[in-house]
């Protein structure tokens, strides 16, 4: 085998391994996402985010936003953060929204968890996504 053929075979094997990792193993996938209200505390509305991590979600990020249903251009976005510290299996996290930003009426809370990977470019091209939206009535 000459050098060019060896390079092409190695590159094809690495690409195939990356594709199989993304399509079959789905490392860091987060599923079973649910969101529930948990009351108010210290000027914040609390919501509990439940999810299941199939493996270490080192490159997963959670984002959440609150949208006013009466005025859809009014959106309150929470801070994007990593799920790097969570355990394999079922996990819970609190999402906090400042109450003084909310007006009475119907609101929509949307939570998105996106998993990418810096080692495998197929996760960047086709990230794993999970989301949940709930309707909330603010008094």
Where in the sequence are the language-model features?
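Contiguous beta-strand segments within globular domains
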Residues: 28-64, 90-94
